[in-house]
Structures are given as structure tokens and as C-alpha cells.
């Protein structure tokens, strides 16, 4: 690099002449003063290049402290403008790539501007001159500084006593001020302030001020250390420790109003309605506490235990409201629909009004996300007048989260059940256990097994927490749990009363949007009702084309989007109001996300609409089948699991056994391959409920008869052609209604479940119970297949086909 050779000589700038050009070394967490010799460890590439450049041409370098030590590549404005010109005495490269350099500060300098050099920092700077001052005043200050510095070093053990001797021999008072400043334990900005001061008198005054402040702090620290040391020597003597505690209380002014801690705990034990076992345990622990030193670690453990034992509610009950009309009003006002849950709650209150011995029910609300399970629990608490506490079980894997840690462990505490009871402050709250199906288990135990005791009405009256070690009565607690699926261990499931919340119909969603979601959006976005309105047709359009869910969470997000864009439009265009209609809806929400109506526009061969149940509600399931020349292979695709594959095999075997009744020549099976595909290919699918849909698809493919586009179906099929019942009927019917299906075929054994289906679903769908495959094909195929006569030519004594239970409806 030849640019360094063109630098202005440093000598001119030391005398206050024109600016010189210097390589700049930014420093972290250190300020180098003139006359100091300091070792530095340099690791940044720019800094190493600057040092190599200076060493190569034997020039001086400018040391400037950066404002933020964490900044790896500081900008010019992130470096203090006052620095120190220094000579590089020695440079040593270390094995790890860093450099150790020994520098000696010579003079203060002020940076005027940085150059645009990229390989290292470079700047123009001029050495600064010290002003002429009164020598007598400076000498007096210097003597005070040396005296205070001697006291400072005596108190601060980190500084070598030899430094005091060296400082007292310095005749140059400027050098004395800088030497003292470099050894002070003050912050970097304060040291930089000392460097920036040119006046020797001001520097000595600042050094004196900083030292006096530090000496005061160090003296207090010394007194504290001495006092602690004396106290430690007396720890074995209880009398003196107690006297010391009294002395401390007197110093704090608490002696008059303060109360004896043991007496206070004893009074709390007397006033609290503890059980007999808990009272005996509390008194035993109190007796133990009396004999302990108050400062011992064990005393702290006992105090914490007694505090927990006395803080949880013992026999403190909320007055449960028994007004059935009030409860019904609260539940109806905050949640639309959900009649079965409301009926169960009101029924419990009715029985409780007649009998005080009834135990709290343990309800499990099972349903897809967004149907209001968690918020319903809060409404139940309000309707019954109970305190509300919530405990989320999602991801809980440690049994100690439920039962607590034993007191042998440091930092142990009760489990979340007891902690929540303390938070409730009453012994009969409504306790929500959220996401109970999301609990896991690992080497630390199985929390679902620990929940068995909590949720068993026969056992939870004597719930034992590992920390408390006494029985606690949970029988008055009303437990409500929520889950998305029934994926809950059997013994735990058996202890709960399952209430399914299948999801909302379109009309229910519309009412929820009008009663709850729109007013909430208006309130949350600081709108006035007259400023923002959405027509009923627009809301219905949002439900149909922008959401596809069992709950209303996505619907709420879309309504919030409308409100947010309405606020933006009002502020931008100064409109007085925004009205969302069916016509301008797409301007606010964009293109439609979902298609509402039938999946296919025409009747097609081999294309059948089935119905599926998922964790988020029901879905339409398209099943496609094609036939091609081959060797009789059956191919299934669409990420199907074992049960569904077996269902397809059973359907294919059934069709093959009844081939002549469907007008299919048996040799055709050996000459054709059939491929059944279930979109979407990336989504795993399982279950037997698509059996009759598979039979319909295979028969349609082999006969060439199209399937009606407006029919959906669900039901398991047997090898004898019977249609078996399925689960999740309500969710599947809601999915059919959302998809614009006109007719739904369900198993005859599920007809009894129609009583729980909302009337508007039954009124808008033609629901046909079927018990045989023959009945299914009558409804699903555009025309019925004609049976054929067929005999085995190679085997004249062919066994006549066995007529199955569906034969009567198909043959002849």
C-alpha cells in the first residue's frame, strides 16, 4: 500500500499545526490516555491492517474509543472524536490470528474528518494544546489528588500499591491527572470525558470528584463486609442472632409495628378452616420452625411450606347461583346454539337447587377448533357464580406439573392444580383443563395418569399433592375439559361426561356474526355502528366463499379484516361510513378462496362424492376411479392408510362377487386394471366410512354408468353388501350442506342420530337411510345396471352364485 507514504508528518500536528492523516484504531471498553503504555489485543481485520500499515512505515496511530463496544465495524459517527496519538512499541501476532500490540500514548488529538478508505479506518486529526493556567492552584489540586489517590488505592485492592509511589513522583501535573484517571474504576463515558478536557486544573478537579465518590462507596462496602463477617462469626449463637434481627428491625423502623412471625403464622393456622390432618401437619411444622435459626435455609423451606398450606382455600366456597333463568340468559347471551351443553348445565343447577350433596360434574367438550369450547367454560362460570381458573395442558409432559415436587428438592413447589386453587381463592371454582388431548408423556412420568385422581369424583376428595403431603378436597370443584379429538387415554375418558360440539350450520354462523363478531369488530377498531355495516347477504357470502371451517375463527378474522379496511378507507377518503354488500365484498377481501356448491358440474363415470370427518369438522371427499387395459390389478393412491385400503379391497371383492348382477362379464376383471384415487394426495386419509362410495365408483367404472353429481354418501360396506353405521354424522351432514349437496345417503342404523341434527340441516338436505348396497346404487347411478346371464364355458358345472342380502334389490 503506497498511500501511507504520502501522509503528513506527525510532528507538525503535535504542535497544534495543520491536521495530520492518521490510521485510526477503534478501541472497545478502554480509553488510552497520553503517557500511558498499554497492551492491546486486536482481532478485527481492519484494525490489524491499520497496525501493519503503521508498523511498515514507522508512523504514529490514532487511538479512539468507540461508543458501542458491541459494534464490530463502527461507523465514523460511532467513534468519539477526541482520541490519543500513540506510538506502536511492539507488535506480536498470536497463533489464533489475533495481534497483541504495545502502544504508548503521546498527545490528545481531535478528529476533524474520516477518509473514504475501506481497508481500515483513516482520519484527519490535529494534536490539542493545553492552555496556560495558574501554577499555584494546580499544585494545590495535585497534592489533594495524590492524597485521595493513596486512600483510594488502600480501599481498592485491585490496584497495586506501587502505583501510589509512582504517582507521587510525577512532576508533570498533566501526566499526573491522566495517570490517576486511567486507574479509576469509572465508566467509559466518564473516562472519555476526562480525556476530552484540555485544562489540567479541570482534569485534576474531575479526578478528585470521581475519587471522592468512589472512596465513599468503597468505605460503605468495607463496612458492610466487616459487619457481615462479624455476623457470620455469631451464627452459632442464637441469642445474638435474634438480637441482631431486632437491631435491624429497629434501624428500619419496624420494631414498633412489626409482629412476631411465628405468632402470625400460629394465628393464621387458628383462623384457617384446615382439615384435621392439615392442622396437625401445620402445627408440627410450626413447632419445627420455632426451634430453628430464622436465618437458616431449612427455616425458609418450612416458612414457604406453611405459606402455601395456609394460602390455598380451605372450606371457602363461592355462593353458587341457583337461578335457572339467569343461567339460561347468560349462556344464550354469550353463545348461540350449543343447546345440548346448555341443557346439561341448567340441569345440573336444577338438581343442585334441590340437593346440596351433589358433586360437581366433570364435562369434556369435544369439538373442532373455533366452536367456542374455552369461552363457553367462562360463560358457565359466570352463569353458576363460580370463580374461573384455567390450566392449559397442551404440551405438558411432566407428572410433577399436576402433583407438584416433593419438598426434598431445592425450589420445589405445588403442582398447577394447587397453584390454580390458590389463585381462585375459593374451594369450588370452575376449573378449565384446556387441550386435555394434547398431553404427552416421557421419562418424567405420565401426566394423564396423574389426572385420573383429579378427575375421579370418588377420589378427588382426597387429592394428595407431593409438596403439601396432606389430602385436599377437590370434590366441590366443577371441572370442564376441552379437546379437539377423542385421542384421550381410556381410563381418563371414562371419568368424563363427553359432550360433542360438532360445529355450526351456516345459519348459526350468520347469527353469531351478527350478534357477536360484528359488534366486537366495531368495538376493537374504535368504529361507530353508523360508520360500518355489513349486509346479511355479504356475511353469508363470506361464510360460503371465504371460510371453510366448523367453527367461526376464520370468519372472525375475515370480519376483522373488513373492519380494518373500513377504518383505513374512512381515514383516507374522509367518508362518513362504509357499507359492505354482496357486490363490493371482493374489493375488501379479494378473490373468493373456496367454491360453494357441487364439486363437479355434471354426472361423470367413476366420480363419487363421499363424506369424511376431520379434527376441524366434516369435509367432502372426492373419489375417482378409472379403468384401463391390463391384467386385473387394483391400484389405490391418495395417501391412504391401512383401514381405507382394506375398505377398497372389500368393495372390489364385493363387486366382483356380484358381477353378473351388475351386468359385468367376469372375464373383464382379468383384462382390465382399475385405479382408485382419492384427492388431495398430500393429505393422509383413513377409516372405513367411504365403503359404499368405493363400491359405487367401481360399479360405475366397470359398467360405464355415470354417478349423480348432487349426491354424497357415507357408510361402511361388508362383503355381504350390508351398510354399517359410521361416526361423525353431524359434521358430515354440515359439510354436505356447505358443499351444496342435495341428497345424502347414510346407514340405516344412523337414522336414530338424526334427532340431534339441527332442523335447518334436515330441511335443506334429503337424507336417505340405506341398509344394502342395492339401495345405494338405486339412488346414486343415473340408470340401473342390467343383470346378464353367464355360465363358465370351461366348467359347465359352475356353482350358482350365492345370493347376498342385497340381491333382492338388484337381481331381476
Curated annotation (Swiss-Prot):
GO biological process per UniProt: cellular response to heat; protein quality control for misfolded or incompletely synthesized proteins
Domain Lon N-terminal: 22-215
Chief place where the protein resides: cytoplasm
Annotated ranges, domain Lon proteolytic: 602-783
Inducing stimuli: By heat shock.
Keywords per UniProt: ATP-binding, Cytoplasm, Hydrolase, Nucleotide-binding, Protease, Serine protease, Stress response
Catalysed reaction, written as an equation: Hydrolysis of proteins in presence of ATP
Transmembrane in keyword set: no
Enzyme Commission number(s) from the entry: 3.4.21.53
Top-level taxon in the UniProt lineage: Bacteria
Subunit structure: Homohexamer. Organized in a ring with a central cavity.
Name this polypeptide is given: Lon protease
Amino acid at each position: 500500500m503506497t498511500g501511507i507514504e504520502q501522509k503528513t508528518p506527525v510532528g507538525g500536528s503535535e504542535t497544534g499545526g495543520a491536521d495530520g492523516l492518521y490510521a485510526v484504531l477503534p478501541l472497545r471498553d478502554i480509553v488510552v490516555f497520553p503517557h500511558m503504555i498499554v497492551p492491546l489485543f486486536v482481532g478485527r481485520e481492519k484494525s490489524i491492517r491499520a497496525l501493519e500499515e503503521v508498523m511498515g512505515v514507522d508512523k504514529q496511530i490514532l487511538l479512539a474509543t468507540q461508543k458501542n463496544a458491541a459494534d464490530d465495524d463502527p461507523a465514523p459517527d460511532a467513534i468519539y472524536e477526541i482520541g490519543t496519538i500513540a506510538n506502536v512499541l511492539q507488535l506480536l501476532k498470536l497463533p489464533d490470528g489475533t495481534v497483541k500490540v504495545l502502544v504508548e500514548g503521546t498527545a490528545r488529538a481531535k478528529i476533524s474528518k474520516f477518509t473514504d478508505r475501506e481497508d481500515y479506518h483513516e482520519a484527519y486529526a490535529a494534536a490539542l494544546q493545553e492552555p496556560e493556567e495558574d501554577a499555584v492552584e494546580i499544585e494545590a489540586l495535585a497534592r489533594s489528588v495524590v492524597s485521595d489517590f493513596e486512600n483510594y488505592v488502600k480501599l481498592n485492592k485491585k490496584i497495586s500499591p506501587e502505583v501510589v509511589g509512582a504517582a507521587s513522583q510525577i512532576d508533570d501535573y498533566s501526566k499526573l491527572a491522566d495517570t490517576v484517571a486511567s486507574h479509576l474504576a469509572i465508566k467509559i463515558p466518564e473516562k472519555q470525558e476526562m480525556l476530552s478536557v484540555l485544562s489540567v486544573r479541570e482534569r485534576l478537579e474531575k479526578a478528585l470528584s470521581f475519587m471522592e465518590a468512589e472512596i465513599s462507596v468503597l468505605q460503605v462496602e468495607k463496612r458492610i463486609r466487616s459487619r457481615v463477617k462479624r455476623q457470620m462469626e455469631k451464627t452459632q449463637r442464637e441469642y445474638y442472632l435474634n438480637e441482631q434481627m431486632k437491631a435491624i428491625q429497629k434501624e428500619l423502623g419496624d420494631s414498633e409495628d412489626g409482629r412476631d412471625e411465628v405468632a402470625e403464622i400460629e394465628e393464621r393456622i387458628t383462623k384457617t378452616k384446615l382439615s384435621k390432618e392439615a392442622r396437625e401437619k401445620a402445627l408440627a411444622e410450626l413447632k419445627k420452625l420455632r426451634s430453628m435459626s430464622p436465618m437458616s435455609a431449612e427455616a425458609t423451606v418450612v416458612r414457604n411450606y406453611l405459606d402455601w398450606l395456609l394460602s390455598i382455600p380451605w372450606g371457602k366456597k363461592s355462593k353458587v347461583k341457583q337461578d335457572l333463568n339467569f343461567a339460561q340468559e347468560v349462556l344464550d347471551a354469550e353463545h348461540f346454539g350449543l343447546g345440548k351443553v346448555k341443557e346439561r348445565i341448567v340441569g345440573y343447577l336444577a338438581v343442585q337447587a334441590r340437593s346440596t350433596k351433589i358433586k360437581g360434574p366433570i364435562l369434556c367438550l369435544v369439538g373442532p377448533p373455533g366452536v367456542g369450547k374455552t369461552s363457553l367454560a367462562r360463560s358457565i362460570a359466570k352463569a353458576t357464580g363460580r370463580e374461573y381458573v384455567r390450566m392449559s395442558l397442551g404440551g405438558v409432559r411432566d407428572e410433577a406439573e399436576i402433583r407438584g415436587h416433593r419438598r426434598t428438592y431445592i425450589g420445589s413447589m405445588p403442582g398447577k392444580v394447587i397453584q390454580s386453587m390458590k389463585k381462585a381463592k375459593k374451594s369450588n371454582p370452575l376449573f378449565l383443563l384446556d387441550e386435555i388431548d394434547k398431553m404427552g408423556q416421557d421419562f418424567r412420568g405420565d401426566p394423564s395418569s396423574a389426572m385420573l385422581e383429579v378427575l375421579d369424583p370418588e377420589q378427588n376428595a382426597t387429592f394428595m399433592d407431593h409438596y403439601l403431603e396432606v389430602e385436599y378436597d377437590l370434590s366441590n370443584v366443577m371441572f370442564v375439559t376441552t379437546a379437539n379429538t377423542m385421542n384421550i387415554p381410556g381410563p381418563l375418558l371414562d371419568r368424563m361426561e363427553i359432550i360433542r360440539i360438532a360445529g355450526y350450520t351456516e345459519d348459526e354462523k350468520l347469527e353469531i356474526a351478527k350478534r357477536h363478531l360484528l359488534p366486537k369488530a366495531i368495538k376493537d377498531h374504535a368504529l361507530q355502528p353508523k360508520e360500518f355495516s355489513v349486509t346479511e347477504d355479504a356475511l353469508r357470502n363470506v361464510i360460503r366463499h371465504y371460510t371453510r371451517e366448523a367453527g367461526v375463527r376464520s370468519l372472525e378474522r375475515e370480519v376483522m379484516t373488513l373492519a380494518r379496511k373500513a377504518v383505513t378507507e374512512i381515514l383516507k377518503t374522509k367518508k362518513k361510513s362504509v357499507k359492505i354488500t354482496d357486490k363490493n365484498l371482493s374489493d375488501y377481501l379479494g378473490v373468493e378462496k373456496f367454491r360453494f356448491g357441487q364439486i363437479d358440474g355434471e354426472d361423470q363415470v367413476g366420480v363419487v362424492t363421499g363424506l369424511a370427518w376431520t379434527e376441524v369438522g366434516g369435509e367432502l371427499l372426492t373419489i375417482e376411479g378409472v379403468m384401463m387395459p391390463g391384467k386385473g390389478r387394483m391400484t389405490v393412491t391418495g395417501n391412504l392408510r391401512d383401514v381405507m385400503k382394506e375398505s377398497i379391497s372389500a368393495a372390489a371383492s364385493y363387486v366382483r362377487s356380484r358381477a353378473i348382477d351388475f351386468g359385468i362379464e367376469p372375464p373383464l376383471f382379468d383384462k382390465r386394471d382399475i385405479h382408485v384415487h382419492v384427492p388431495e394426495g398430500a393429505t393422509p386419509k383413513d377409516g372405513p366410512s367411504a365403503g359404499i362410495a368405493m363400491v359405487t365408483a367401481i360399479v360405475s367404472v366397470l359398467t360405464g354408468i355415470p354417478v349423480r353429481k348432487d349426491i354424497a354418501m357415507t357408510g361402511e360396506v361388508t362383503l355381504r353388501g350390508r351398510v354399517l353405521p359410521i361416526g361423525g354424522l353431524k359434521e358430515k351432514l354440515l359439510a354436505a350442506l356447505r358443499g351444496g349437496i342435495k341428497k345424502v345417503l347414510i346407514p340405516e342404523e344412523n337414522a336414530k342420530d338424526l334427532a340431534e341434527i339441527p332442523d335447518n340441516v334436515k330441511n335443506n338436505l334429503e337424507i336417505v337411510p340405506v341398509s344394502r348396497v342395492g339401495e345405494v346404487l338405486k339412488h346414486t347411478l343415473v340408470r340401473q345396471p342390467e343383470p346378464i346371464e353367464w355360465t363358465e364355458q370351461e366348467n359347465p358345472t359352475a356353482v350358482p352364485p350365492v345370493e347376498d342380502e342385497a340381491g333382492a334389490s338388484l337381481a331381476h
